């Protein structure tokens, strides 16, 4: 596969354009989960994700600040959320429960990490994949692919769906080979929780 930039290695719903739909195949059905929050570098204000293993309760402010180590401060909320008592630009952005899956993006023809931090999307994934039709799975061995559509109209709405995959044995074999090669090369999605790069677990430059 061609070299891809780090941005191409992740499918993040909030990065989709308005009215964009992406189609992908799930490569492993069980997601990796973690708490995630963002910090801002106190020198140049660049953002960095800080991740924590999933426990019953989100990490405390003390745990977050300890992980940030003094060179980052907590990012502020980008939106008001009266239900959660969050004020845009004032309240610390709270940790969110994330779910990630390795996927094959059929539009970009590459393996990516699909990261979901939006409860509305995860709820749809859980509901759709729980249907009797998909009880044997929706991974590469199945006949299905998934779509995610983003629409901004006053607020952002995401629609997740499972659909019949266009039959193409050669393509599916190519995807399976790429996935096996990537795993042999050390791909490790659990690295995300440890602050590492799943595509480069050894940290090679």
Go through the PLM ranges and name each one.
Residues 109-205:
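Compact mixed alphabeta submodule
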Residues 1-113, 120-123, 127-135, 191, ...:
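OB-fold ssDNA-binding interfaces and closely related basic DNA-contact patches used
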């Amino acid at each position: 596969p061609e070299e891809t930039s780090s941005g191409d290695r992740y499918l993040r719903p909030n990065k989709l354009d308005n009215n964009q739909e992406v189609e992908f195949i799930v490569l492993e059905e069980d997601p990796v989960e973690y708490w995630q929050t963002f910090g801002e570098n106190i020198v140049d204000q660049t953002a960095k994700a800080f991740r924590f293993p999933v426990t019953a309760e989100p990490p405390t402010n003390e745990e977050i600040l300890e992980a940030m180590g003094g060179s980052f401060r907590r990012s502020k909320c980008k939106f008001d959320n009266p239900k959660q008592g969050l004020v845009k630009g004032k309240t610390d952005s709270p940790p969110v429960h994330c779910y990630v899956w390795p996927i094959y993006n059929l539009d970009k023809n590459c393996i990516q990490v699909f990261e979901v931090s939006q409860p509305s999307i995860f709820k749809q994934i859980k509901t759709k994949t729980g249907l009797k039709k998909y009880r044997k799975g929706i991974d590469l061995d199945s006949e299905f692919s998934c779509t995610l559509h983003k629409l901004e109209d006053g607020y952002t709405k995401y629609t997740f769906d499972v659909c019949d995959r266009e039959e193409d044995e050669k393509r599916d074999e190519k995807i399976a080979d790429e996935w096996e090669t990537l795993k042999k090369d050390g791909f490790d999605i659990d690295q995300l929780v440890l602050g590492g790069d799943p595509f480069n677990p050894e940290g090679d430059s």
